[in-house]
């Protein structure tokens, strides 16, 4: 039997229908019923009866700015779904037919690792944070210095395009900044902004911005694509042709895309690149600004994406190497370009499937108030062991930077439209790291200058191939003076790193703990309970528990405690200069010291050296548990005769009196960047099949999973139980034409009304494969008509002190709870109305949270909404509402409740429930 979730039904809530019946019938809807303590929804939550299904609605007292991180509804730690935002910026709706069945307890709203539906009580001042670290030594080159070319700027606008899954065409507009006085073709840098409000009212009050598309009359598009002009001018002065493209049409519609719009953004990028490739061959067909610019060299392309734009450029790089399914793609031309690298600024990574063989730089803003879990770290961590590991994947952590100020059109005082600091500053509880004016927080200008410098660094390394800039990006501990006073730290994987110790693989740990990056059990999780803030390395994915994402947790209480990591297969460090470890310690801590040693398969051991690591400045609102790259030379091992071609274990010994640390990985390191060639890999895409339940019989359907490309590889397949929301996973070897990824689903037909049901499937690349569309499944539509609801009065004209009573009946039983919402309306004809002092005060409090005083008609009581709920399998329900004797002589009083629509307003043709209460005297 298929059931929807039960959201709230207590005795008081169920007994919330009042009055008689108009004699009409209405179609009922499935409504979930009970769950929070005492049967009440938490403040801000409600159920709205939709036209096809009920909706779980959360309304924020403060406007939630349109941002890049997804707003997610969770219950008891599991993901329910991604709600649709309302245009008012306050309300979010999730169709309950799409959410998991089972009890809804502990309802919460999350976005980018930050909880939105509650705030920490300001009972005590936050602990002091560490100050900014000392400046690093300057690197051998400074990529932030402008070049010697003059620049020219212009725009182009092409015909809008239709993208799969989006009902409204998307604009093809861009701003170009190019060098002048240049001979020969020049590399191309393409920028894509993130998810921001799309339209604004000129000269309006702050906050008059929306996510509508197309923009309504009287409003203008927000020019988010013009927010990187400073970055474009710097690159253009250094000889790059730059273009920044607009994606408002995607931002206004991506709530309906299962992947958050990643595939649509990839299609848009490649549509622009396709035009640039054509214009390079046929300059006369190009827009004027493109004709004025040097010819673009499409064999040297750098993609720069901010926030969801970062996920878009990652997908575009993937799709350029491994073509996506044609039905889901908006670009069907040739790939006449080569992506040399990507820059991802505060990016989302909902699928956690980065492209492994394209070099990348991920910018992590330490005070990001939007994608606040800094999930973009997965563009580094998620590439390990997937392919050959030759591409450099770097992350730079910018202390004190927020999310928005990398884009001037998202920066107050610089933007045309309303803009704000995304790191919300609570005046009653200022953050010691990220509140404006603290020693660590950057100004908008300082932040943007740092961003420009590191974008230019990536261009110089990935496109121009200048290895002198690498120490700024690969954990070598060098800085670019142009980014001062920003403190920018880096670590990396790939490039000339060799084999290493990877906790995700087959390892055993003694003296420490092999911990899970994502696990609801605090004893298994790496951070567990008590951590102040979060870790980008442990950003949560779609499932509460994941397999194969691990780290090594160290904790010691005396000098000399040792943690040993032993690998199943010996590691070769031959040819490496140093062992590079990525280690983090708790924020704001100083002077953690560790001795590092290795042992070979013959038992020869050598202590390589001692490292010291300090924590980043952090607070409970930051993701500051981020790994620093620490290097120890291998010279001591060579002197000790250790066979570096066959190392079996790594040891870390605490030399502080006590401490905690986490090891992400360790690699053989030598300088330089290797030549990168994309491997031939199979690509996996999960689709979604939608079927009708049918009236009888059992049908077996298979979740559509497409494997394309060549070769074979491994993925991890997660199948989510629709009843519990928990996921089971298994490793699967995939190859084109194979049937290893087979998820059968049995659908049993019947003629009873029920809820739609989704069987979700998720995939992640593990080794030798890439993943495009990471989520899909089977959605079963219940195709049976809803039963009719009628109301029979049992006592609809009573003396005060008695209860009004009715029987709610269905024309036939359903396989789901059936409910409807009613709101009070004034009686017709000006009749006296039942007031707050005419009903039982406890019933009033349970039904609405209101008190009787001041006395007012029930139709004036905020939040008074009356639910009926008939449990699955039953056909009737008796309900009542208690009245009280008020000892005040008065005429007969009436009350009326009208059935509501999606928005909670009464339906003109909905059921009308009337009742009359007579004076007892």
Predicted regions and their residues:
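Secretory targeting and sorting signals
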Residues: 1-28
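Active-site-adjacent alpha-helix of alpha/beta-hydrolase-fold enzymes
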Residues: 358-435
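Short, surface-exposed "cap/lid" segments of acyl-processing enzymes
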Residues: 180-240
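Short boundary segments that mark the start of a structured unit
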Residues: 30, 676-921
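Short conserved active-site loop signatures built around small residues
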Residues: 32-191, 198, 208
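Alpha/beta-hydrolase-fold serine-hydrolase catalytic core, especially in secreted/extracellular enzymes
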Residues: 29-50, 65-67, 72-79, 85-88, ...
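Alpha/beta-hydrolase active-site loop
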Residues: 226-231, 258-298, 303, 317, ...
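Extracellular ligand-binding interfaces
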Residues: 74, 549-646, 653-663, 668-675
